[in-house]
Design a protein with these regions (language model features):
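Short acidic-glycine loop/turn motifs at beta-strand connectors
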Residues: 14-15, 83-85, 132-133
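Trp/Gly-enriched beta-strand/coil motifs that build multi-repeat beta-propeller-like domains
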Residues: 1-55
Length: 191
């Protein structure tokens, strides 16, 4: 796919690796898997990134629990909503932090439709808390808005490490996770 200015290209390999040339901007590595090969590739309308559509949802990580649960893979930058029968109700690209939370099994202990972080007036919606960091709870929520009213990252940047600890989702996907879970729902964190 050529950039709008005609001086760069995005190139996607059969395995989904994205290569950039010239003026094409690279916003993180996204790779396909044999269970979810690349089906389509498109440059965003603002020419600041790209989207890859896979032909199937990626499979669940090995050793990721049983029963109804949320699975968060930090290395894959992905969350799955898994039903009791093992079917997948949703899977979303996310942004977390490389070193937390630690791989383990947790339970959701609190949910808030709207919340403000304890510093810098950072606002979040659809907060679903499942563990604790050094000073604050860690959970799933939408892309936060800072004290100046600006989004702290773009949707195109989901799929890369951007957070100070929580797991960020697109607004509609954060709402879906919020509505799908309840206090006590299992959360399995894997690498």
């Amino acid at each position: 796919e050529q950039t709008f200015d005609g001086t760069g290209y995005w190139l996607v390999s059969q395995r989904g690796k994205v290569f950039t040339f010239g003026s094409a901007i690279h916003f993180g590595q996204m790779t396909a898997h044999e269970l979810a090969p690349v089906g389509a590739f498109a440059v965003s309308n603002s020419n600041d990134g790209y989207w890859m559509m896979t032909t199937g949802a990626p499979g669940l990580p090995a050793d990721s629990g049983e029963g109804r649960r949320v699975i968060f893979s930090n290395q894959r930058h992905r969350v799955w909503l898994v039903e009791d029968d093992g079917s997948i109700s949703g899977n979303f690209f996310v942004s977390g932090r490389a070193d937390q939370p630690k791989p383990d099994t947790y339970r959701i202990f609190s949910k808030s439709r709207h919340t403000i972080a304890g510093h810098d007036d950072i606002r979040m919606e659809y907060m679903v808390r499942f563990t604790w960091g050094v000073e604050q709870a860690i959970g799933f929520h939408n892309i936060p808005i800072d004290g100046f009213g600006e989004a702290m990252q773009s949707e195109a940047q989901l799929g890369s490490y951007r957070s100070e600890g929580c797991v960020r989702l697109r607004d509609d996907q954060a709402a879906a996770l919020f509505n799908w879970t309840k206090v006590g729902t299992q959360v399995v964190v894997v690498d």
